Amino acid sequence: MQLTAVGLNHQTAPLSIREKLAFAAACLPEAVRNLARSNAATEAVILSTCNRTELYCVGDSEEIIRWLADYHSLPIEEISPYLYTLGMQETVRHAFRVACGLDSMVLGEPQILGQIKDAVRVAQEQESMGKKLNALFQKTFSVAKEVRTDTAVGENSVSMASASVKLAEQIFPDIGDLNVLFIGAGEMIELVATYFAAKSPRLMTVANRTLARAQELCDKLGVNAEPCLLSDLPAILHEYDVVVSSTASQLPIVGKGMVERALKQRQSMPLFMLDLAVPRDIEAEVGDLNDAYLYTVDDMVNIVQSGKEARQKAAAAAETLVSEKVAEFVRQQQGRQSVPLIRALRDEGEKARKQVLENAMKQLAKGATAEEVLERLSIQLTNKLLHSPTQTLNKAGEEDKDLVHAVAQIYHLDK
């Protein structure tokens, strides 16, 4: 089985497909353990973010696709058009590019590197990684660090979090006059909330499944932040001008009916809603309502392109560095794969040497001259070492040109 990757991202699949193939954080340990113990793969890492789901494996790509479809109870033909399947070298290149932010919606964004590290940590905890994936991701983190240190690819990047504030400012002139509701209390919400907090909104509320986690985030945000439970949403939604949601829920949290009731109470005041979750937290039909401005991760593309031109120049240098590191890694791995063969070859040579030497000692004991023994020894050793390759070449026909070329290279006969 070889190193391979199967996946889809914001470039190959719309949100409606990506959300069907996303892995919830709570399910990820069981999923990666299951994959690494299936007939599809012997090693596995699953990366699942709002913009991509990727399975890095040592395995069979067709079986991995079948496993992915079965896991999500989807027909293969429904997901296949959106998937990419990568061979060994392209898997290495892709992993390096993703970690460097070169494949991100926001060119050079740093958050993806942390997400890859989290995915690797989960895989390690589930013992689903072996020598090949460990080597790949150790090199991936090293390359990402070098690219981000030696190039300007990540400078001036507009993050999804900062873009959220920019988008809200297009609808409301002053964030300071707004009540902002955050649904969820994970990493993405914390990043977005931090940007909003810098604009000093009138009120910030964090709604979460557990009050303790909501309170923890409120404590970080400042005095004008308060916690509440998700179950409170129907009663309080109308009080907020901005709603940002990003949870790990597999089902929508905010439905069209809930928003309709909130809009009636708001009396035509606009409600800005940003759904950064995959799968989506807010029903898509909410976008059809008057005075409800619903945006998803796919709607953020134009906003996050700010400063992209300057970063693209830096990206060219980053791509060159990535290509060099890919070639270096592939050479190292191919060298390691040859080690057992080299050992076996040397063992065979040593075996032949001992046999010929034993014969020579017997001849000397019988009174043969040293010259005769050395002559016979050299002929026997030559015959033993060349017997197997000579036999193989005699059997090889014209169609086996690769073998003939390989032998010519090994013995430097192609000059």
Curated annotation (Swiss-Prot):
CDD domains: NAD_bind_Glutamyl_tRNA_reduct. It catalyses: (S)-4-amino-5-oxopentanoate + tRNA(Glu) + NADP(+) = L-glutamyl-tRNA(Glu) + NADPH + H(+). The keyword NADP applies. NADP(+) binds at residues 184-189. It holds the Pfam family GlutR_N. Substrate binds at residues 49-52, 104, 109-111, 115. Possesses an unusual extended V-shaped dimeric structure with each monomer consisting of three distinct domains arranged along a curved 'spinal' alpha-helix. The N-terminal catalytic domain specifically recognizes the glutamate moiety of the substrate. The second domain is the NADPH-binding domain, and the third C-terminal domain is responsible for dimerization. Belongs to the glutamyl-tRNA reductase family. This is Glutamyl-tRNA reductase. It comes from Neisseria meningitidis serogroup C / serotype 2a (strain ATCC 700532 / DSM 15464 / FAM18). The lineage of its organism: Bacteria, Pseudomonadati, Pseudomonadota, Betaproteobacteria, Neisseriales.
